């Protein structure tokens, strides 16, 4: 099972809530939230595509350091385009697409967001809570 878990989707779709629910079930797991990384390590970046790619590269580097030490890592960020996903190396991650909303709260992100072609789990708005989704998501990690 892959140790790097990417939780991606539009802003406001529930990525961080799901990340916390998975973390609570898995216990000793490192989480990287893109908003926190952007407000500290990458506070100089804008939201241009070039800087979004740099943000994805940073998220990849951080998560790769965690998994190199034999830990699981959750990375919670929008990852809106094929270019940002390639920069993150998403095919070497367990990808969870949180697809619970049609539009996010930022128009510029809505305009560039491309639904992923590859994902392991697609979280939809079917009435289940983040905790219920998390229970289903973590099962293969321990089965």
Regions found by a protein language model. Name each.
Residues 15:
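Conserved lysine of the Walker
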Residues 86-91, 106-107, 112-118:
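Short loop/helix-cap segments at secondary-structure boundaries that form the rim of catalytic
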Residues 19-62:
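Conserved substrate/cofactor phosphate-moiety recognition/catalytic segment
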Residues 2-6, 28-30, 72-74:
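Residue-level preference for the first positions of well-ordered beta-strands
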Residues 48-103:
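Glycine-rich phosphate-binding loop used to anchor ATP phosphates in small-molecule kinases
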Residues 5, 21-25, 91-94, 115-143:
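NTP-dependent small-molecule kinase module
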Residues 41-42, 103-112, 132-134:
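Short, charged, surface-exposed secondary-structure boundary motifs
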Residues 10-11:
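The conserved Walker
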């Amino acid at each position: 099972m892959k140790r790097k878990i990417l939780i991606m989707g539009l802003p406001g779709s529930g990525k961080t809530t799901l990340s916390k629910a998975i973390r609570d079930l898995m216990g000793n797991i490192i989480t990287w939230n893109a908003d926190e990384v952007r407000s500290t390590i990458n506070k100089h970046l804008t939201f241009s595509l070039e800087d979004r790619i740099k943000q994805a590269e940073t998220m990849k580097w951080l998560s790769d350091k965690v998994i190199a030490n034999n830990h699981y890592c959750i990375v919670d960020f929008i990852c809106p385009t094929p270019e940002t996903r390639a920069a993150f190396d998403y095919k070497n991650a367990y990808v969870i697409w949180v697809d619970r909303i049609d539009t996010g709260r930022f128009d510029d992100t809505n305009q560039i967001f491309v639904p992923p072609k590859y994902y392991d789990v697609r979280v939809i708005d079917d009435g289940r809570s983040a905790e219920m989704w998390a229970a289903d998501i973590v099962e293969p990690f321990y089965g």
